[in-house]
Every structure is written in C-alpha cells, then in structure tokens.
C-alpha cells in the first residue's frame, strides 16, 4: 500500500503556513477575482490531489492568470460531489476529479449502463481501463456536465483512489480537470491539456513520496515544473 498523507497532517507536520494551508479566504478570492484570477479546488484527503491541483494551477499561471489552489473541506465529508458542485455554483473555477467518479455522480444511469457493457463484453477479464473504455467514459462524462461546465483532456493516469466509498461501479478513473466554461479560452485549455498529457503514475508516485519526505508539496514539485517547462 502506498503511503498517503492528508493535507491536514502535512500542514501540521510543516508547522508553518504554506500556500495550500493558508490561502486567502475563498469568499475573498471570489470578491476580488476577475477573469485572470482563478481558483483551483481539490479534495484534500491525500497529497496526490494537492499535487495535481498545484500542477494545473501552475499551468494556468504560465498562461497569464493569477491562480490559487484551495482545498475543498466539504469534499472531505461529501466527496467529489462537493467539487463538482463548487464549479457548477461558481465557488471555484477549476476542480480536479476523475472520469468514472464524475460520471457516476452526474449520470448514475449512464455510468451503470457502461459498467454493465464493459463487464458483458469482457466477462471476468474485462479491462475497464482500456483505451476504448477510457474514451467512452470520458465522452459520457463530458455529455453529463452542466452546460456552464467543461472538461479538459483526461490523463491516461488514474486517480481518485479515495472515492471507493462514494462510487460503486467499476469504471476508468482517469484524472481530469473540469472548469467553468466561460472563464478559460483555447490557450488556457491547452495549458490544462499539457499537464493531463504529461503526468503519469510513476511521476505522481515519485512526487507523492518526495512531498512526504520534504513535508512540502511546493518544494517537491518545483523541479518537475522546471524539467517539464510548465
């Protein structure tokens, strides 16, 4: 089993204020924000989600925005549904989710249909993580999003290990950022797509271990930013 450190535990271990532990209040960000100020939200149940949020945040900074990452405390109790709601209601601008979990929350009937289809097609050896299944679940998730919400390209890497108690179906769980559609232009979306296309499981595991070792997500991922020209 991989080591996981919750956001709260990491903040306590640091014993100092870090960017994700003590950001400006969410309401303040919404008050002072404009199109160039973006809030990236994530489920703070483990460091991997924080790492992903900071990667997407940095890509938006590079695209000319002032972006912040913000841990969504509601998602600790309410799961990824709280992240989706925060985008739909305009409390955040970008959220890090996963395709299967998002689809099951947004359109349970379609999620069940696809899960049964994959199981029937492959029986006990069904590969729900095949490229075909991944693309089909992503397309269904995009179709299920509210009309004011859009999605960047999914990563080939899966996440949302902590959604097991929230979702019941065997579906691909590819990492994907969703966002408020009117706020991001083509260039911004390409910036998100770059991160999705670049990140892989080995990278995430290494960054996760490094963040725990250094007790700092920002310090762990800074070399990755530079090496990958984010």
Briefly describe each language-model feature range:
Residues 168-186, 206-207:
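A bilobed periplasmic-binding-protein/Venus flytrap-type ligand-binding module shared by bacterial periplasmic
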Residues 47-66:
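Short, polar/charged alpha-helical segment
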Residues 15-20:
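C-terminal motif of bacterial Sec signal peptides marking the signal peptidase cleavage site
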Residues 187-230:
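An extracytoplasmic/periplasmic, membrane-proximal ligand-sensing/linker region
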Residues 65-85, 102:
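Short helix-initiation/N-cap motifs at beta->coil->alpha
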Residues 54-59, 76-95, 108-109:
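Short helices/loops that flank or line small-molecule/ion binding pockets
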Residues 21-25:
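Bacterial signal peptide processing site
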Residues 33-47, 66-71:
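Short, well-ordered beta-strand elements
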């Amino acid at each position: 089993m991989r080591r996981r450190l919750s956001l709260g535990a990491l903040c306590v271990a640091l014993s100092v204020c870090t960017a994700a532990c003590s950001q400006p209040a969410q309401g303040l960000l919404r008050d002072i924000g404009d199109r160039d100020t973006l809030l990236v939200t994530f489920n703070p149940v483990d460091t991997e989600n924080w790492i992903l949020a900071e990667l997407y945040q940095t890509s938006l900074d590079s695209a000319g925005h002032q972006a912040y990452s913000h841990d969504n405390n509601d998602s600790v109790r309410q799961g990824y549904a709280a992240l989706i709601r925060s985008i739909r209601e305009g409390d955040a601008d970008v959220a890090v989710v996963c395709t299967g979990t998002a689809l099951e929350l947004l359109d349970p009937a379609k999620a069940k249909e696809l899960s049964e289809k994959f199981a029937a097609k492959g029986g006990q050896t069904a590969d729900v993580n095949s490229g075909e299944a991944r693309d089909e679940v992503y397309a269904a998730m995009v179709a299920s999003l509210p009309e004011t919400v859009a999605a960047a390209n999914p990563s080939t890497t899966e996440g949302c290990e902590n959604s097991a108690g929230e979702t019941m179906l065997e579906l691909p769980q590819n990492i994907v950022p969703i966002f408020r559609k009117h706020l991001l232009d083509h260039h911004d979306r390409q910036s998100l797509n770059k991160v999705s296309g670049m990140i892989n499981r080995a990278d995430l595991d290494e960054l996760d271990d490094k963040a725990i070792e250094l007790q700092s997500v920002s310090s762990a991922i800074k070399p990755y930013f530079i090496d990958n020209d984010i």
